[in-house]
Structures are given as C-alpha cells and as structure tokens.
C-alpha cells in the first residue's frame, strides 16, 4: 500500500517549469505576428477592404480633361492657321437598374469574406502550431523516459560487472547487459534528433530565423480537456465554422450577381456636363458649357435570358456547396468525437497500466538487487515500464490532437490564446 500511495503521489505532483519559459499563448502570439503566410493573408484582406469603395461601385461621376493643338496650311495662299483647344467633361450614371447598389454590396461582401478567409488561415495556423507545441512536449517526455531507461541499464551493467568480477555472474549476463545498455543509448541519441526536428518545425512556424534561439516551454506535460460535449460542439460548428461562413458569403455573392444581371431589365439614366474652349492664332476665342440627360433602355442583347438562368444556377450551386460542407463537417465531427472519447477511455486504462508497470518494476528491481531475479527478467520488467510510459504518452498526445481538431472545427481554436 505504501508503494502504491507513493506512485499515485508521484503521478499527481506538478512538474516545475523553468524561469523565463514561454506559454503556448506566447508562441501563438509570436507566430501570428511573424508568420509569412498570415502576412500574405492579411494583405489580401486589405486589398478586399481597399476595393470596397463607392468609386469602385460606380456611385461617383467620371470627369475627363482634354487639351489639344491643331493647325492647317492653305495650299493656295500658304498661310498657316492654328489654335488650341481644351475642355472638361463629366458623366454621372444616376440610375442603372440597381446595378451600382448591387456592385457596392458585392464589394462589401467580398470585404467580409476576406476577413473570414484570413480567420480561416489563422485558425489553421493556430491548430498546426498548437499540435507541434504539444508534439515537442511529447518528444521531451519521451526523451526523459529514455534517459531514465539508459540510467537503469547503466546501473544494471555496473551491477553485472561487479558480479562478474567476483564470479557470481556469467559472461553471457555481462554481454546481454552491455547490449541492452547500448540499445537504450542508441534510442536516446535518435530521440535527440526527433526532438530537434520538432523544435526546428516550431521555429519555422513562428518565422524565427535564428534556429539557435533558446526555446523553453512553460508546459512539461500534455494536459487533456475531458469536458467537451458533442451537442455544444455540433451547435458551434454549424454556427461558427469559418469554412461554412465562407460558403455563406459565396451564396450572398451569387445573389448579388443575380441582382446585377436583373438590372438590365430596367432603364438607365445618365447626366453629362462639360465646358470646352477654343483659341485661334488670330486671337479669336470661344467657349461654352454643354449639359444633358440621357435615358436609355436595352431592348435586346441576345444573352439576357441565359445570363439570368446561369445566375440562378450559381445561387443554387453555392447553396449546394454549403449543404455539402455542412454534411462533411457533421461527418468529420462524428469521427473526431468517436476518436476523442475512445482515446479518453484508452488514456484512463493506460494510467492504470502505468501504475501496475511501475509497481512491477519496483518489485523486480528489489528482487534483482537481492540476486533472486535474472538479468533477462529484470530487462523484461524495465521494458514493460518503458512500453507503458510510451503507450500513455501516445494516448495523451492523440487525445490532445482530437481536442485541437474539435476546437478548430467548432470555431473555438483561439481558446489556446487564453
């Protein structure tokens, strides 16, 4: 009972973090500021915002200024006549069947869609960085487990050497202990490489140019949120998923395109005004103001009917794409939820297995020190402990990946910024 109580206390104790360590939120904030893909996405969003103006929609008049010089030669008298001309003309479309209003509304919708797509890129980025952050934690924990295995193998090799020197252990025992120590050392070296790869990947995601910059994580364990519920996730997904919001923007854009097409069924009204001036070499000058109103109606252009039908089909297709994505999201959520719940159950089971493996290893070590357990049996107990540690680590990380994906699909991924 004392041993079990000690094991449970050891599992429950928090691990102290280093001074100056950075949290996940710190890493995300750095990445959001530096990542090149996100900078491009923000620039594209800014372009959409810049385009959403009254001028681009056609609300404002067009003004043109002209100037010229002309000359003539009388072939009979040889006299040269020349002069200069200049003028300013303006034209303003007052009404064109609501096409201007539809165009402006479309530009505003494109602006909102640009913001949604930037959010989509940000959420993808946060999910990727969060997964890599916890992957590095996973690699660090695995490194710690392998280092412990190396220490145990080294201690066993020391004991066998002492026993071999006094004749109480065979050369076979010594060779096997050496092989096991070398194998554990090789795994530890390989794990250093995997840990460095994960660290470099984090540097890349955060656009950190100096790969030697110290990288100290505030977290040393993979904490899993077991409080998620399916109904709340489904409701949030249908309401907040960025990809689904983008499809709804597409429906609105298709509706505005249809409205612009329908504008051809209405007359148009245009106002124009101008001032023109002409001056000749003889000193004569004249100028004047002209203005007018033009009303017109497009009786037939040969394409109006098909364009209306195509615009209606585009609305239908946009709505079908939305429904298709909704169905896909429901399916993805169901798969992720099943994996999430299964991994939670697996995690609970592996916690029990780890306690058993730790107790078994403790007993085996005591018996080995007393000489009542062979080196092979001691190695089996050590390997069982390492396997149990690896299984619970994989269960923790896989559960965390499911949690990250569930938060992303439901539009709640930015919670990791808190």
Report residues per predicted region.
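Acidic, low-complexity, intrinsically disordered peripheral segments
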Residues: 26, 391-418
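Small/polar, glycine/serine/threonine/aspartate-rich low-complexity segments that form flexible
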Residues: 66-96, 102-103, 216-227, 259, ...
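Periplasmic alpha-helical coiled-coil/stalk elements that build and connect Gram-negative outer-membrane
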Residues: 26, 124-236, 336-339, 343, ...
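Bacterial N-terminal signal peptides
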Residues: 7-15
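Sec/SRP-type N-terminal targeting helices
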Residues: 39-43, 56-60, 94-122, 147, ...
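Bacterial Sec-pathway N-terminal export signals of envelope proteins
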Residues: 19-64, 209-252, 326, 337, ...
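A short glycine-centered flexible hinge/capping loop motif at secondary-structure junctions
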Residues: 164-168, 368-372, 409
């Amino acid at each position: 009972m004392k041993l079990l109580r000690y094991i449970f206390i050891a599992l429950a104790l928090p691990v102290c973090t280093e001074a100056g360590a950075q949290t996940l939120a710190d890493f995300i904030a750095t990445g959001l500021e530096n990542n090149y893909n996100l900078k491009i996405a923000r620039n594209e969003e800014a372009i959409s915002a810049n385009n959403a103006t009254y001028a681009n929609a056609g609300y404002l008049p067009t003004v043109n200024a002209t100037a010229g010089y002309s000359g003539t030669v009388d072939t009979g008298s040889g006299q040269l006549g020349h002069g200069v001309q200049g003028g300013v003309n303006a034209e303003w479309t007052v009404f064109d069947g609501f096409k201007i209003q539809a165009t402006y509304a479309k530009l505003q919708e494109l602006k909102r869609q640009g913001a949604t797509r930037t959010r989509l890129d940000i959420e993808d980025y946060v999910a990727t960085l969060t997964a890599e952050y916890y992957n590095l934690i996973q690699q660090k924990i695995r490194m710690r487990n392998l280092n412990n295995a190396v220490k145990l193998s080294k201690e066993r090799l020391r004991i066998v050497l002492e026993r071999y020197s006094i004749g109480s252990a065979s050369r076979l025992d010594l060779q096997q202990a050496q092989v096991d120590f070398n194998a554990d050392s090789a795994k530890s070296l390989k794990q250093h490489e995997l840990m460095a790869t994960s660290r470099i990947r984090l540097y890349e995601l955060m656009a950190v140019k100096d790969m030697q910059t110290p990288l100290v994580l505030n977290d040393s364990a993979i904490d899993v949120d077991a409080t998620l519920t399916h109904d709340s996730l489904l409701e949030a997904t249908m309401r907040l998923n960025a990809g689904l919001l983008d499809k709804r923007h597409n429906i609105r854009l298709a509706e505005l395109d249809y409205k612009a097409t329908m504008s051809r069924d209405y007359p148009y009204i245009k106002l124009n005004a101008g001032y023109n001036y002409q001056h000749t070499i003889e000193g004569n000058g004249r100028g004047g103001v002209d203005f007018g109103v033009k009303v017109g109606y497009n009786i037939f252009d040969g394409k109006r009917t098909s364009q209306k039908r195509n615009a209606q089909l585009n609305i239908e297709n946009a709505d079908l794409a939305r429904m298709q994505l909704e169905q896909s999201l429901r399916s993805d959520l169901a798969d992720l939820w099943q994996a999430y719940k299964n991994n939670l159950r697996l995690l609970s089971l592996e916690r029990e297995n780890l306690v058993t493996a730790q107790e078994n290893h403790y007993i085996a070590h005591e018996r080995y020190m007393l000489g009542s357990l062979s080196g092979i049996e001691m190695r089996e107990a050590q390997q069982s402990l390492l396997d149990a540690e690896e299984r619970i680590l994989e269960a923790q990380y896989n559960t965390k990946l499911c949690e990250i994906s569930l938060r992303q699909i439901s539009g709640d991924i930015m919670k990791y910024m808190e």
